[in-house]
């Protein structure tokens, strides 16, 4: 699509491999990835992740806010990277978290993991974590999945209602561990019309590797702005991450080296493209039947 996408992520200093995941995926979709923001350039989208200096978070808020005023179609995906597995990262202060909240006030999409989501709204981690870890995912029938999803979504509404930082916002909470699966919650809230769509996505537990968050953000951004609806985008994104984790494991890649996905990126993009074509054909067929 040849869009200018600014990537704001201090992992380029600490974990270059994870950081480059974003660049690889954005480039594969035909967009141009820019490292950080230059004030004299115009951007079509912004992806933010780990920001080491808490004061810089507010600077980015102002820069992105001004950029979105100049280009109202510019999209901002904010991943407030500061914690995991119930614990903050070493250098994270209360100021970091408060400033991330302010940054999310100008974002269109937020993608915190479960720990970050709970910390952002001052909810206890252990109690919530234990509540979901006992839930068993059974996929032997669509009816069972639908019943489970409805139950989980209803239990999640108090969290989703608190974590929304602007009137119209897409919230994606990742890394929610169930007994035998990993859950991702997508909540699309349209405050202008009082509409809401919330859905669950279940994926296999494989293994933890650095860089999954950067892959998720870049792939979800690209698929959701390249013809996929948000539910299909989430499904395509989690499927790609799982395929990449399996590939890394099967190739005996050291987990310290992150996720090895480049050899299967093109193949997976072709699968996504074909699914999108089939879905569009199906949609057109349904439209013809209705008319």
Language model features with spans:
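Short, small-residue alpha-helix embedded
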Residues: 119, 206-230, 234-236
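Short acidic/histidine-rich motifs immediately flanking catalytic phosphotransfer sites
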Residues: 40-45
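Glycine-rich phosphate/adenosyl-contacting loop at the front of the ribokinase-like
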Residues: 1-36, 283-291
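Short pre-catalytic strand/loop immediately N-terminal to key active-site residues, enriched for Gly-Thr
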Residues: 12-14, 197-211
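Short, well-structured alpha-helical segments that form the helix of a local strand-helix-strand
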Residues: 148-163, 229-245
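Conserved phosphate/ATP/ADP-binding segment of small-molecule kinases
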Residues: 90-196
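A short helix->loop->beta-strand "cap" motif at the edges of active sites that frequently abuts
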Residues: 65-76, 165-169
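Charged C-terminal helix
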Residues: 231-291
């Amino acid at each position: 699509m040849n869009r200018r996408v600014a990537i704001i992520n201090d992992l380029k200093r600490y974990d270059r491999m994870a950081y480059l995941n974003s660049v690889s995926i954005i480039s594969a979709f035909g967009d141009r990835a820019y490292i950080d923001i230059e004030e004299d350039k115009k951007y079509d989208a912004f992806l933010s992740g780990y920001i080491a200096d808490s004061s810089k978070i507010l600077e980015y808020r102002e820069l992105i806010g001004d950029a979105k005023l100049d280009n109202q179609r510019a999209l901002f995906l904010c991943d407030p990277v500061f914690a995991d597995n119930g614990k903050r990262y070493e250098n994270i202060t209360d100021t970091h978290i408060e400033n991330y909240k302010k940054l999310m006030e100008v974002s269109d999409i937020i993608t915190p993991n479960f720990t970050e989501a709970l910390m952002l709204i001052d909810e206890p981690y252990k109690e919530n974590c234990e509540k979901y870890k006992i839930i068993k995912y059974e996929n032997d029938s669509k009816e069972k999945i639908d019943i489970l999803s409805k139950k989980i979504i209803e239990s999640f509404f108090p969290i989703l209602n608190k974590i929304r930082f602007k009137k119209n916002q897409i919230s994606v909470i990742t890394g929610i561990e169930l007994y035998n699966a990993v859950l991702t919650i997508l909540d699309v809230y349209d405050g202008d019309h009082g509409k809401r769509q919330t859905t669950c996505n279940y994926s296999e537990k494989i293994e933890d590797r650095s860089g999954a968050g950067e892959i998720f953000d870049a792939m979800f951004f690209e698929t959701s702005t390249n013809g996929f609806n948000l539910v299909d985008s989430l499904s395509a994104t989690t499927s790609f991450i799982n395929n990449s984790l399996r590939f890394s494991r099967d190739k005996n890649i050291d987990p310290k080296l992150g996720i090895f996905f480049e050899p299967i990126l093109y193949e997976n993009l072709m699968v996504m493209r074909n699914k999108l074509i089939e879905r569009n054909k199906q949609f057109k067929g349904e439209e013809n039947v209705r008319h």
